[in-house]
Amino acid sequence: MKVIGSLKSAKVRDKDCRVVRRKGRIYVINKKNPRFKARQGY
């Protein structure tokens, strides 16, 4: 999982990427291609 400052570029990398919020953190998840996972990092 990558930790990046802005999820804007992460969510457009693949059409199956979804932005979800868990425990106050924002994540990008992708069920079909899990290597696109990312987390907002501040």
From Swiss-Prot:
Stretches of the chain forming a coiled coil according to its record: none
Keywords: Ribonucleoprotein, Ribosomal protein
GO MF terms, alphabetically ordered: structural constituent of ribosome
InterPro entries named among the record's database cross-references: Ribosomal_bL36 (IPR000473), Ribosomal_bL36_sp (IPR035977), Ribosomal_L36_bact (IPR047621)
Swiss-Prot/TrEMBL GO biological process terms: translation
Pfam families noted in UniProt: Ribosomal_L36
Any GO CC annotation of this UniProt entry: ribonucleoprotein complex
Superkingdom, natural source: Bacteria
NCBIfam families, per the entry: PRK00831.1 (NF002021), rpmJ_bact (TIGR01022)
Family according to the record: Belongs to the bacterial ribosomal protein bL36 family.
Protein name listed in UniProt: Large ribosomal subunit protein bL36
Organism name: Ehrlichia chaffeensis (strain ATCC CRL-10679 / Arkansas)
